[in-house]
Amino acid sequence: MVITAFAASGLLIAITCAVMAMVMLALARNPLNLIWGIFCLAVLFWGAGAYFIGISSNGFEAVLWWRIAYIGVIFIPVLFLHFVLSFLRIRSPIHIGFFYVATLGFLGANLFTHSFIAETQLMFGELHYMVPTTLYNIFLGWFVFAVLFAHALIWNQISMAQGSRRQQILFFFLGSFIGFLGGGFSFLPVYDVAIYPYPNIAVALFPIIMGYAIIRHKLFDIRVVLAESLTII
């Protein structure tokens, strides 16, 4: 078994997101922590899926892991937007329920049909990369819209916030921007852009930056985090 660079990045993503998810889900009584914990689980699905995609020896096996990985990827935009709206305490002009309905539609197509992910092609001599379908193209457009919309909301709040609150939002924007930018390179080979998705490893930096923000800038109340975690132990 050969561990490709793509597989290694997926493994690192899975590890960092698993740690963050465990901490946040331990605090599930706070809705903000719950949403962020579930978001980390969604990214964990991508990381674990990317690992197994990276070590798949044939296209049939890779298709299975692409579908498993996209169980998480499909939920990433709606959970990220939901967290942003809750964290910033603002109302979206587009109801979050619309995004969840769309998410369930894409999830159903991924799990029960071949209209979302159907086949792969060999890329870079080692990766069985998925081939886009019409429905996948629609999903990607929706993904990009939701993520850019969420980042626009964050950026707007940075300009209005002050003091420690501004630092919190700024670190969150930095972490999410790096994570989504790095993860975005994983979409390129889908469309025959022959750039190896090395930057996928940047997704693992997102939980690390968030962890720093939690401790340094009290993005979440670290005293509550420690107290709740010790209670559960």
Write out the residue ranges for each language-model feature:
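Individual alpha-helical transmembrane segments in multi-pass integral membrane proteins
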Residues: 2-17, 27-150, 173-176, 195-206
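Hydrophobic, aromatic-rich alpha-helical transmembrane segments
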Residues: 7, 63-67, 133-137, 161, ...
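Alpha-helical transmembrane segments in multipass membrane proteins, preferentially the mid-helix core
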Residues: 19-23, 79-83, 143-163, 209-219
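Membrane-interface helix-boundary motifs at transmembrane edges
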Residues: 23-35, 85-95, 155-168, 219-225
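Interfacial "cap-and-anchor" motif at the non-cytosolic start of specific transmembrane alpha-helices
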Residues: 49-52, 165-233
